[in-house]
Amino acid sequence: MSKKLRNFLVRIIVAAFASFAVMAIPPYHHNTVLAKTVSVNQTYGEYKDYYTVIGESNIDQSAFPKIYKTTERVYKGQGTSEKRVTVSDVVYNPLDGYKRSTGAYGVVTKDMIDMSKGYREKWETNPEPSGWFRFYNRADNEEISEKEYDSRRTKSYKVTNNVPVVLTTLKGKKYNSHLFVASHLFADSLGGKSIRKNAITGTQMQNVGTRKGGMQYIEKKVLSHITKNPDVYVFYSAIPEYQGAELLARSVLVSALSSDGVINETVRVFNTADGFNINYEKGGLLTESPVSEIDNIEDSTTDEIENSVDDSEEIVYNDTTTEEEEN
């Protein structure tokens, strides 16, 4: 069998597996670090901080990258610092047949945290995760997939799903913003990269919850424990959970196991926002917004992505959307 034919068959198999839906949340196990399926019938209302602890990590340490010593310059691939650092490589699984991120995992060390402190890596070119855009033919405005868009960019266009909404701070102040951010799977504060394979289209609430919720619950727990105990390292993985062929993850399964055993848990972080009806199938919100003008085309949302992430720690959500938002 030729290499070309073999690669073609592999792509078909990957896409086929991605299309199957499981109608109930599967029991958690950590034999593989891959995207998982999750039920569309979940009830999230009881999880006001957008996460729940579901058990121990069940992490197989032998499946994780090894810790090693190198220089900061070599590890970061830039700069001139020859400082010796103890690190691990972070593994970013490839996008699946629907161009969705499928997981990231690695071992977090004190040096990885220190190198990330006070520094935000710029996002790679075209980092927007699945569900961020919708794609259309220019000739007839027929909706197409991202793969089809990639194959004929001069004859198609894309429209952002991330429409403006009204959000509310913990102090009750309302302001205009966007509901979605490019949410890191492996947190940049823990050494994760700002690349598409390490991001999902997540709500601001999924990203930070309230002051203690969302992805920040487990991220801050790991960061704090390592900062206080510099010799400790943490096995860490984040796996998005999709329903069938939906482009937006319903949740993210995050597991953490510290070398001293103090941290040993798996949390499910919900990609939801009370008061908003999210379109998980295609991205955006479930409101009527037919495509009528190509003037709405948005070729880059990098600023939106960069400015939305850690600056929103105090953001909570509206209990209801306004009439203006619905229209």
UniProtKB/Swiss-Prot annotation:
It catalyses: Endonucleolytic cleavage to 5'-phosphodinucleotide and 5'-phosphooligonucleotide end-products. SMART domains: Endonuclease_NS (SM00892). InterPro entries: DNA/RNA_non-sp_Endonuclease_sf, Endo_G_ENPP1-like_dom, Endonuclea_NS_2. Keywords: Endonuclease, Hydrolase, Nuclease, Signal, Virulence. The keyword Magnesium does not apply. Disulfide bonds: none annotated. Transmembrane segments: none annotated. Residues 299-327 are annotated as: Disordered. Residues 1-24 form the signal peptide. One of its GO terms (molecular function) is deoxyribonuclease I activity. Its EC number is 3.1.21.1. May have a role in S.equisimilis virulence. This is Deoxyribonuclease. It comes from Streptococcus dysgalactiae subsp. equisimilis. The lineage of its organism: Bacteria, Bacillati, Bacillota, Bacilli, Lactobacillales.
